[in-house]
């Protein structure tokens, strides 16, 4: 192996790309001439990674959506597989996205490439049979939730808890007054965050019920809706249509006053300054827990996806904050329980009662403590392990 290692990176989702984009410069600090290729988003490409496959071309959610797009996803997977066989990378770093990455791990293993997996597949929740692939094809597993370390070690996988990268992200510096001025919000009112997800399908499934809940919570609050930068213009247009319909329905009913929903770009600032938020299950719930302000978790998928998930998911909670705490810290409204009336029931105390807010914030502080690790950052720990694996490969190459 030369001093310019050839590194395969695979990150198929927004959170994975965030971590991948942090790893590229960290590895370049050790290997200035390192070459990166694989699956990733625009940020990773901007940092010099050659994208064999674009993350936006393979990122889908839900079992039914995966099935519908399977031919296209398989075609993109074959591109990645061919690139691995042709280039024989010195190291592979696979980030989350198990439906693709566990298959790539086999190809990499067969090519003799060391495999480092960062952000574990949630095999502890479902599809535990896939642990066999991890045992066979993954050399090191680096996990971001503390209970995952024991799970993998119990199955004979070399696994280490490195802390959650989001614990290292500082709180937004923008003040409440500045945020209010920037978005024409009333600082005298309570603000409620609406976070329906970062994908078009999530917004279609989640936002209408959130809007209905806002109507019931009332116009005496401000509602803040951050939209992910990855949404297409068509998806943003769909959001505008939903908000326009809300205003039109209020005009039709003269006695009604529509809640004011303001679209913004900064989800973290929204979570930081909102009195409480309604958050779709996903990485945003981890961000919300770490920021520490109260929230309610909601989750909805297609009926078929949910029917299958009910049979195979074995964990007692959906919200990661509750899994980490091993108790109910935040409310969960799943599938049929995800209704406007139920949201209002859970949100009203968080908006109106300081005591209810403080009780939840105490639980969220415990979650944050469990996700943190003393010393170096999660990205620094991953970089260190990657460096050790490259050094070991170089030493073996010299022996041969």
Swiss-Prot record:
Annotated InterPro entries: Glyco_trans_19 (IPR003835)
Organism superkingdom: Bacteria
Reaction equations catalysed: a lipid X + a UDP-2-N,3-O-bis[(3R)-3-hydroxyacyl]-alpha-D-glucosamine = a lipid A disaccharide + UDP + H(+)
A GO term from the CC aspect: membrane
GO molecular function: lipid-A-disaccharide synthase activity; phospholipid binding
Documented EC number(s): 2.4.1.182
Keywords: Glycosyltransferase, Lipid A biosynthesis, Lipid biosynthesis, Lipid metabolism, Transferase
Pathway: Bacterial outer membrane biogenesis; LPS lipid A biosynthesis
Entries under SUPFAM superfamilies matching the protein: UDP-Glycosyltransferase/glycogen phosphorylase
EC category name: transferase
One GO process term, biological-process aspect: lipid A biosynthetic process
HAMAP family the UniProt entry points to: LpxB
Family: Belongs to the LpxB family.
Entry function: Condensation of UDP-2,3-diacylglucosamine and 2,3-diacylglucosamine-1-phosphate to form lipid A disaccharide, a precursor of lipid A, a phosphorylated glycolipid that anchors the lipopolysaccharide to the outer membrane of the cell.
Protein name: Lipid-A-disaccharide synthase
Annotated organism of origin: Acidobacterium capsulatum (strain ATCC 51196 / DSM 11244 / BCRC 80197 / JCM 7670 / NBRC 15755 / NCIMB 13165 / 161)
High-level lineage: Bacteria, Pseudomonadati, Acidobacteriota, Terriglobia, Terriglobales
């Amino acid at each position: 192996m030369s001093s310019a290692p050839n590194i395969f990176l695979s990150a198929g989702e927004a959170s994975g790309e965030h971590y991948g984009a942090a790893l590229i410069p960290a590895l370049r600090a050790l290997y200035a001439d390192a070459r990166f290729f694989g699956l990733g988003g625009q940020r990773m490409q901007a940092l010099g990674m050659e994208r064999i496959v674009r993350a936006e071309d393979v990122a889908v959610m839900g079992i039914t959506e995966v099935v519908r797009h399977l031919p296209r996803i398989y075609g993109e997977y074959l591109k990645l597989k061919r690139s691995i066989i042709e280039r024989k990378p010195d190291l592979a770093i696979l980030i989350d996205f198990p439906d693709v990455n566990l298959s790539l791990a086999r190809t990499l293993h067969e090519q003799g490439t060391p495999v480092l997996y960062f952000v574990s597949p949630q095999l502890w929740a479902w599809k535990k049979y896939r642990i066999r692939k991890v045992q066979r094809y993954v050399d090191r597993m680096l996990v971001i939730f503390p209970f995952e370390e024991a799970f993998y070690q119990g199955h004979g996988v070399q696994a280490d808890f490195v802390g959650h990268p989001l614990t290292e992200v500082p709180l937004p510096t923008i003040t409440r007054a500045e945020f209010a001025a920037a978005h024409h919000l009333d600082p005298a009112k309570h603000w409620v965050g609406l976070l329906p997800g970062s994908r078009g399908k999530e917004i279609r499934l989640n936002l209408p019920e959130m809007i209905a809940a806002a109507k019931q919570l009332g116009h005496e609050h401000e509602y803040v809706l951050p939209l992910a930068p990855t949404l297409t213009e068509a998806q943003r247009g769909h959001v505008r249509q939903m908000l326009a319909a809300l205003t039109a329905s209020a005009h039709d009913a003269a006695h009604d006053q529509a809640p004011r929903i303001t679209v913004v770009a900064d989800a973290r600032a929204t979570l930081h300054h909102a009195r409480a938020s309604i958050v779709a299950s996903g990485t945003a719930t981890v961000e919300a827990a770490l920021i520490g302000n109260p929230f309610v978790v909601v989750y909805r998928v297609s009926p078929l996806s949910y029917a299958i998930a009910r049979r195979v998911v074995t964990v007692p909670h959906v919200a990661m904050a509750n899994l980490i705490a091993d108790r109910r810290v935040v409310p969960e409204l799943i599938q049929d329980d995800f209704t406007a009336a139920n949201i209002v029931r859970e949100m009203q105390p968080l908006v109106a009662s300081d005591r209810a807010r403080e009780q939840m914030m105490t639980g969220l502080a415990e979650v944050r403590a469990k996700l943190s690790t003393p010393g170096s950052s999660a990205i620094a720990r991953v970089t260190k392990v990657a460096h050790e694996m490259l050094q070991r490969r170089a030493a073996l190459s010299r022996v041969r």
